[in-house]
A protein has these predicted regions:
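Intrinsic disorder/low-complexity signal
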Residues: 1-14, 38, 73, 77, ...
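Nucleotide-state-sensitive switch-loop elements of NTP-binding domains
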Residues: 2-23, 27-129, 135-140
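Conserved beta-strand segments of the P-loop GTPase G domain that flank and frequently precede/overlap
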Residues: 17-18, 47, 111-114, 142-148, ...
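Conserved GTPase G-domain signal focused on the G5
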Residues: 24, 239-255
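Short, glycine/acidic-enriched loop or turn micro-motifs at the edges of active sites
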Residues: 50-52, 116, 182-185, 240
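Conserved catalytic-core segment of NTP-binding enzymes
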Residues: 119-218, 224-226
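Beta-strand-loop-alpha "switch" segments that mediate conformational coupling across diverse proteins
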Residues: 224-239
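The C-terminal output helix
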Residues: 254-262
Length: 263
């Protein structure tokens, strides 16, 4: 499917929030919007998930106003996954309508809450099209490492590989964020060590598994290291908001050349 391209709008800074299902994308969207608003910046939220029922924030722009997931499922006799695929592809054809709403609101920051199933957004051409054609002066992506999933070193490597794959697909500067820090307790220290000392992570893998799983995990790890994987993983609590100041600073380095919102 070919989609109509539109001209860029200057001034707007766009933040995509991606991650595995249940990693806390919508909660972080809500917290980040609240943070910007409290500190004097005009932020708006775009919901890109056509199948979501309840959200912890008020949408400024909502794709559910443009496509009806349930109607498509009934009209074409599709299952839930098939309907989500078709609906997500249809969203790209509504880019002019979505952009007009964004232009009318004219925010400083647009926070984009991406679909729960990341493959529908990151690996289909419609998702890449939306990333490229939402008009914005600067864009970045926040990828969420679900703290509940990555307490195991093998799982950590798997999610790190996914994060790298998403960065490749979206072609955006990416900030990696660790969510649910309030739920993982003392394991937080180990996870943060893995991100700064890959030999520590490799030792943890060897203590957990052996054989083919060990070989595959360490080979992936070394490949990520060659690609410059070692980087800061910012811990965030979506419950308390702890860590948001560090996240905003990281966003400012990308979007505002280091100039932070007033706090």
């Amino acid at each position: 499917m070919k989609y109509k391209q539109i001209k860029n709008q200057t001034g707007l800074k766009t933040i995509f929030i991606s991650g595995t299902a249940g990693s806390g994308k919508s909660l972080l969207t809500s917290k980040l919007h609240e943070y910007y608003s409290k500190n004097g910046a005009f932020a708006a939220v775009l919901n890109l998930d056509p199948g979501v029922e309840n959200l912890p924030y008020t949408c400024d722009v909502d794709v559910r106003d443009h496509v009806d997931y349930v109607s498509i499922m009934k009209q074409y006799s599709l299952g839930p996954n098939g309907a989500l695929i078709m609906t997500n592809d249809l969203i790209a054809s509504k880019i002019d309508d979505i952009q007009n709403e964004i232009n009318h609101i004219n925010p400083d920051y647009l926070i984009v809450d991406t679909p729960g199933q990341i493959e529908l957004f990151a690996y289909r051409s419609s998702g890449r099209f939306l990333v490229e054609n939402i008009s914005s002066e600067e864009k970045t992506n926040i990828f969420l490492f679900d703290g509940a999933l990555i307490t195991s070193p093998v799982n950590f490597v798997s999610i790190a590989l996914l994060a790298t794959s998403i960065r490749l697909r979206l072609n955006l500067p990416t900030i990696n964020v660790l969510t649910k820090t309030d739920l993982i307790g003392i394991k937080l220290k180990n996870i943060l060590q893995w991100t700064t000392n890959l030999s520590t992570l490799e030792n943890a893998i060897s203590n957990e598994t052996d054989g083919e799983t060990y070989t595959l995990s360490t080979n992936i790890l070394r490949g990520l290291n060659l690609d410059g994987f070692t980087q800061e993983l910012l811990p965030i609590s979506n419950v308390t908001g702890e860590g948001l100041i560090n996240l905003e600073s990281a966003l400012s380095r990308i979007l505002n050349l280091g100039e932070e919102v007033e706090g």
